[in-house]
């Protein structure tokens, strides 16, 4: 496991239900957190009620040491920090391993989803890349509330095996071969959750939210069909379900961020007060650039970009958006 946040902690908790703790290796950069976990068996900063009984020797701030010890490498840091996290890693370190992305984001500056970034920068074959996605907040996993996730990979056999490591009485898994659609849908839903929050912040109610999200899933469908035109059911939980929970949930940091923007916070002040990464902020800029190539009609995504990066007034931009929805 590469990452020390709430989703990383939740996945560690799930894995420890199915495999021996001594087979789990965990990297994080925070030495104080590492020492705390070694001594008290819980993460002091995220999901602190979740017990993690990994041997002390298996938790380290040496990323290459952790990667060399494992066959499946789970990347679980904010997309904006991925390049820096992997700066000591060489393509040879990933050779022969399955790389699992639990990152629902896009790499800034590169404007690439995680699978594309790994393939181009680390020569990881697409067949060796897996994606974890779906409507699954870490907070509810920690509380053992029933949740569903999707494991996507071109190598369906590997996805099925990895899914079996996560299956518990409170977590059900699905398997898909659509890594590109799954990743792009996960990136886009963060933008639409920001839009949902902005609309709530400026005073729109549930009726409009329903229209907004209905249009958002159509935008996702249009875009993923343009990028990777295969047969897929956009109503599956990896697409529609993930959008719904991110747009509506109290745990959604992207909705929270958008709500603050709608209420008049600047981007910087909202980020400082949240003290967490809202992936939708970075995704809005990246998708704006990517869509210059595909030219898909995406008025909601464009409106979020206008508010966050062109400093358009949220109230005015959302009012303009209402004329483009149906």
What label would you give each PLM region?
Residues 68-69, 188, 240:
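Alpha-helix C-terminal capping/helix-to-coil transition sites in glycosyltransferase folds
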